[in-house]
Amino acid sequence: MMNSASVRWQLWIVAFGFFMQTLDTTIVNTALPSMAASLNESPLHMHSVIVSYVLTVAVMLPASGWLADRIGVKNIFFAAILLFTLGSLLCARSETLNELLASRVIQGIGGAMMVPVGRLTVMKIVPRDQYMAAMTFVTLPGQIGPLMGPALGGFLVEYASWHWIFLINLPVGIIGALATWFLMPNYTMRTQRFDISGFLWLAVGMATLTLALDGNRSLGIPPIAIFALITVGLIALLSYWLHARRNERALFNLRLFDTHTFSIGLTGGLLARIGSGMLPFMTPLFLQLGMGFSPFHAGLMMVPMVLGNMGMKRIVVQIVNRLGYRRVLIVSTLLLALVTALFALVALMQWIWMIPIVLFFLGMVNAIRFSTMNTLTLKDLPDTLASGGNSLMSMTMQLSTSLGVSIAGILLGMFSQPHMAAGSGETHMVFIYTYLSMIVIIALPALIFNRVPADTIKQSTLPRKS
């Protein structure tokens, strides 16, 4: 594929960055109960550890590409790895939940820049006719990360301590930073002026509203401060809307929403990912606290879901071409709600052998819906708006995951009782009520997807080599 050894090394550097970022998105979930015990917190209130990271990624994503073009991909990628590694070290040294949350924010700033800047690096070092092959190479470790994350996290927690889920990032991060500094050229390009005002309005709006959503229960923020956060958040989002209406170079052009499929895909996708974003957080928590599984056993149970997700992506195009976008989105959404209910039933009935089968099917359905949503959202955008639409969709994906985990944490807190024992009847009831609420949330986007036009253009498939 490549003739130049230096280019090959640069692709390996980007691949390791992808691996670090995607591994971290799943390795933490299995460790939350152990973290809670170590930090003297309730395991049902530990969702903020995930929210702080994912929300930071969502806030920082819009600025990452511009920074790479302006300052250089080498400098930004190097800084991203350093920040991610420093955040990992601080996470491992945290002795309170607040320290851990602050460290996750630092880690999230680095994680937000790694993947988009990595993609930009590949675009600059590889000829266009080799871009797909290069991206396939660098994203493969990114697919292995989520596969390894839950089981590796459970293994480290069970046989070492939760601190090691962050400490394992240190040697990889140091090697990656040194390799970036010595082997990667610092590509730059002329950029337009960055929309600082729009970026700040959106960042403030997303951060304050997400914090207000669960600040009272998980962080003890008083009601008057919650009201102030909601007010500030709504004013910030309204200010961005007014700013974007009169600014053609706004961070995200409002003309994006003139495309009907983009509007439906983005709003439906936001609500859909809130529901499905709960699943990677809730599943290992339910298996450990509700069913009494060990961290490693719970982590292993997550592997079939990732395998189902990876295996289904190859045939999504054929399914959409055969059934159409609207039918695929509606059926997959309702099917995901049904399979989620089936998982809770199978687990509570102690049919342990069926759990990995149901989770594999859950991953398959999730992959169909995700891939179809992403394609629908971007497929009709004009070329001049495609980049902005892709960035907005990426930001919305992270934001909706953050909201989903927050809402799952709120539901657990609403239904929980003090001093519940793992595997007890009271704990089972908490998870039953939470899963019933989740099923409704997961099914709701079907109402939005019902508005998808029936006459969609079929997607082409890549030709197979004979």
Curated annotation (Swiss-Prot):
What HAMAP family does the entry give?
MFS_MdtD
The protein here is known as Putative multidrug resistance protein MdtD
Instruction: Tell me where in or outside the cell this protein is found.
Output: Cell inner membrane
CDD domains with a match to the protein in the record: MFS_LmrB_MDR_like
The membrane-spanning stretches of this chain are 11-31, 48-68, 71-91, 105-125, 137-157, 164-184, 194-214, 218-238, 262-282, 286-306, 328-347, 351-370, 403-423, 429-449
Say which family it is in: Belongs to the major facilitator superfamily. TCR/Tet family.
Q: Which organism is it from?
A: Pectobacterium carotovorum subsp. carotovorum (strain PC1)
Keyword list (alphabetical) reads:
Cell inner membrane, Cell membrane, Membrane, Transmembrane, Transmembrane helix, Transport
Spell out the Gene3D superfamilies in the cross-references: MFS general substrate transporter like domains, Multidrug resistance protein D
Do the record's keywords include Cell membrane? yes
Q: Which GO terms describe its molecular function?
A: transmembrane transporter activity
Question: Carries keyword Cell inner membrane?
Answer: yes
Topology in the lipid bilayer is annotated as: Multi-pass membrane protein
CC terms in the record's Gene Ontology section = plasma membrane
